[in-house]
Amino acid sequence: MALDSVWAPQAAIIGDAPAKKVGNQASLQAQVLQTASLKDGPAKRAVRVCCKSSMPEEPTKSTVTKERPKPEVTKAVVVDLGTGYCKCGFAGLPKPTHRISTTVGKPYMETTKTGDNRKETFVGQELVNTEVRLKLVNPLRHGIIVDWDTVQDIWEYLFRQEMNIAPEEHAVLVSDPPLSPHTNREKYAEMLFETFNTPAMHIAYQSRLSMYSYGRTSGLVVEVGHGVSYVVPIYEGYPLPSITGRLDYAGSDLTAYLMTLMNNSGKYFTEDQMSIVENIKKKCCFVALDPIEEKKVPPTEHTILYTLPDGKEIHLCQERFLCSEIFFKPSLIRSMQLGLHTQTLSCLNKCDIALKRDLMGNILLCGGSTMLSGFPNRLQKELSSMCPNDTPLVNVLPERDSAVWTGGSILASLQGFQPLWVHRFEYEEHGPFFLYRRCF
């Protein structure tokens, strides 16, 4: 079978030893070849993924064999819809070319009238360019879609304006979060096939795609996004939902807690200024390796100046690292769930001995919130202190905030993956349940 090579960044290992590579897989196997490339500067890992359907095709009852159309895989589109951002671009590229906020604007009721044909949803740059008074709406809650009409508006904007493409000419690969309702996949198929008339589509779990971006076929994916966090054990390409951990705190909760800390110290922000607080988080905050020792440091060593959009300057001090403690002590935001490190160890302890040993050396960090300075080292420290007799190894990629999209880009561009596309004529003939034959 012909294999294509796709470049993925070399992962850094936070622990003391190289992560162990896990063996072959029946339905989806990956060979990780250590190579170097001058392209983009750093060393790259060539990942060759050989795919084949694990389910044999059922013989057609018709006497006439309908030939399956083959989409242009080089022009397949990969879409990763998250609570914070929607990333998209063509398969085969190292990172997404388009990234817009998932939060959209809707006109207030008093500005719209019955029969009014004015625009109902403002997406991306439209939010900046309009003078219409808008309320901000997010169609996702903790990673799960609750407003499909708004998602359709976002994708319409992405396809037609951001990417400037006709979706009916491109196959689309969509990411789906762990533990999501099965109806999600059927809704995606309905929207892509019936609204956008795409010729083919495929849905893949986000955690699996994140793992592919690391060039692995097994691993413990620890993903901390904007609206939800997951700890997902994956063995030979298959997520293990029975021992997957879900945490309902993530980056948006960190932002809200940062606002609380700043308000308590006399720097007052409102909900309408959350985007400013989000920017402060990204530019000024970090994760302390030891928060107790960090508090002993003279405040002047932590204090920095931040200039607000109106030109006013504020001083930021201990809130720069205190806000991130919610990931390791969620009781700070009145959450009864486990800390991220404790949930990670809990998932590992639910695995059998052999699998635990393999996953312990393949802890893969993903998601935008893990980009905070010091995050990987703190998680490594917490895990090492909780299991001193084992050797947990936290692996990180420099662009792990786009790990899901990059994994989808790798997968959708491979020749061996092409039999796993679900085509529109198959959906029309067999219905939405045909998805589960190819998207598993």
List each model region and its residues.
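C-terminal region/appendage detector
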Residues: 2-14, 18-21, 29-33, 41-440
